[in-house]
């Protein structure tokens, strides 16, 4: 008798992707974040669906509808905080996933890597639009400031901003369309994640050594399903600790005040996961230059496969590149801190140095280190 999972058209796809998939025998816990991101997406879509049942995308009632969810809906407060903190968790996993890809040279799988960058842009767009929906002070002013950046685009900028706003300022039309896009984008992200997996399974997973592992593969189930399950348990433990004990730890107190176009908050800043890019944006005095730097701060990842000079794929046996990688990680932490600070000395100069260092490490120091390490291999 044939096994159903190997013959049934639908089950066969699941089988090839999650059960009989040949996986390298030595992949570490850093490879858990793909499945954890899948879990985060499921949490966000499920909690978001229930929130959408009670939310009204209208400037007069949006803020009070969120209040109503927290006060009057059964476990509404839990769903709302799961959704808000789920976004933070999503980005923690996302940045760790990207960091692992950079450390172990996973960017050599160019199709998978490029789809990943598109996924990052889509997730950032979704999170930004979601932050606007509660219609608090930071929602309104964040939407105004960030959408206004598009006016820096020559010739079409102003028209583009007014087209996105649906008027001459951020108002009801903006909130309505942001809600529509915020609802549909996670499903597009889910579809793109499938494409991401499709490309990954064409080549097979990378491993910590960065060498071909065809001679030593093991089935995904039960080895990595159990390993992923452990990761999921740990992630959920951290997640519910955050949601139930410190729900407002990562939020902004200003967003508990209803949006008021006549009163500007003293420090307009996005959620913590955008602060590093926001710091890079602010470090350039020119508006168009800042917008270009902001986009490049993410788009620079697409250059990694093209500026790779080292003969070894992984950084595991490359001490100079390892030092530069951790310097880059530290630099991103500094940028995140600077993004949350007011625009005044000494934060301005620290932000400018950190921004310059960010691009210099990726575009210059890393390729040079690769060449030096190639020479060291011959000694």
Swiss-Prot record:
Cofactor: binding comment: Binds 2 heme b groups non-covalently.
Regions that span the bilayer: 33-53, 77-98, 113-133, 178-198, 226-246, 288-308, 320-340, 347-367
Keyword list, A-Z: Electron transport, Heme, Iron, Membrane, Metal-binding, Mitochondrion, Mitochondrion inner membrane, Respiratory chain, Transmembrane, Transmembrane helix, Transport, Ubiquinone
Keyword Metal-binding: yes
Positions that bind a ubiquinone: 201
Main location: mitochondrion
Cellular compartment(s): Mitochondrion inner membrane
UniProt cross-references to SUPFAM superfamilies, sorted A to Z: a domain/subunit of cytochrome bc1 complex (Ubiquinol-cytochrome c reductase) (SSF81648), Transmembrane di-heme cytochromes (SSF81342)
Membrane topology: Multi-pass membrane protein
Residues the record lists as binding heme b b562: 83, 182
Annotated binding of heme b b566, by residue: 97, 196
S-S bridge residues: none
GO biological process, one term: mitochondrial electron transport, ubiquinol to cytochrome c
One Pfam family of this chain: Cytochrom_B_C
Any GO CC annotation of this UniProt entry: mitochondrial inner membrane
Function: Component of the ubiquinol-cytochrome c reductase complex (complex III or cytochrome b-c1 complex) that is part of the mitochondrial respiratory chain. The b-c1 complex mediates electron transfer from ubiquinol to cytochrome c. Contributes to the generation of a proton gradient across the mitochondrial membrane that is then used for ATP synthesis.
Entry-linked PANTHER family: CYTOCHROME B (PTHR19271:SF16)
Family designation: Belongs to the cytochrome b family.
Stated name of the protein: Cytochrome b
Organism name: Dipodomys insularis (San Jose island kangaroo rat)
């Amino acid at each position: 008798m044939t096994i159903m999972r190997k013959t049934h058209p639908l089950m066969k796809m699941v089988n090839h992707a999650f059960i009989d998939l040949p996986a390298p025998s030595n992949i570490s816990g850093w490879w858990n974040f793909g499945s954890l991101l899948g879990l985060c997406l499921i949490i966000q879509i499920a909690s978001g669906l229930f929130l959408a049942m009670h939310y009204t995308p209208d400037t007069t009632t949006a803020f009070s509808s969120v209040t109503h969810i927290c006060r009057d809906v059964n476990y509404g407060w839990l769903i709302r905080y799961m959704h808000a903190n789920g976004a933070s968790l999503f980005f923690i996993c996302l940045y760790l996933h990207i960091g692992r890809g950079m450390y172990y040279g996973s960017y050599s799988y160019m199709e998978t890597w490029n789809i990943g960058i598109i996924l990052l842009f889509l997730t950032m767009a979704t999170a930004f639009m979601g932050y606007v929906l509660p219609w608090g002070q930071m929602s309104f002013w964040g939407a105004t400031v960030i959408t206004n950046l598009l006016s820096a685009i020559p010739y079409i900028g102003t028209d583009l901003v007014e087209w996105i706003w649906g008027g001459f300022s951020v108002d009801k039309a903006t909130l309505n369309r942001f809600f529509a896009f915020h609802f549909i984008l996670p499903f597009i992200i889910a579809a793109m994640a499938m494409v991401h997996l499709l490309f990954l399974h064409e080549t097979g997973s990378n491993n910590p050594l960065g060498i071909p592992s065809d001679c030593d593969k093991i089935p995904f189930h039960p080895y990595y399903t159990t390993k992923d399950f452990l990761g999921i348990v740990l992630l959920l433990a951290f997640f519910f600790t955050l949601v139930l004990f410190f729900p407002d730890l990562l939020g902004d107190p200003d967003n508990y005040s209803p949006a008021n176009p006549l009163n500007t908050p003293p420090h307009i800043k996005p959620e913590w996961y955008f602060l590093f890019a926001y710091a890079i944006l602010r470090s350039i005095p020119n508006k168009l230059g800042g917008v270009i730097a902001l986009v490049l701060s993410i788009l620079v990842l697409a250059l990694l496969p093209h500026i790779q000079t080292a003969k070894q794929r992984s950084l595991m046996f490359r001490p100079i590149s390892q030092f530069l990688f951790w310097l880059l990680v530290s630099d991103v932490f500094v940028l995140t801190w600077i993004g949350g600070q007011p625009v005044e000395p000494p934060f301005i100069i620290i932000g400018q140095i950190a921004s310059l260092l960010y691009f210099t490490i990726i575009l210059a120091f890393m390729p040079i280190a690769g060449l030096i390490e190639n020479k060291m291999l011959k000694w």
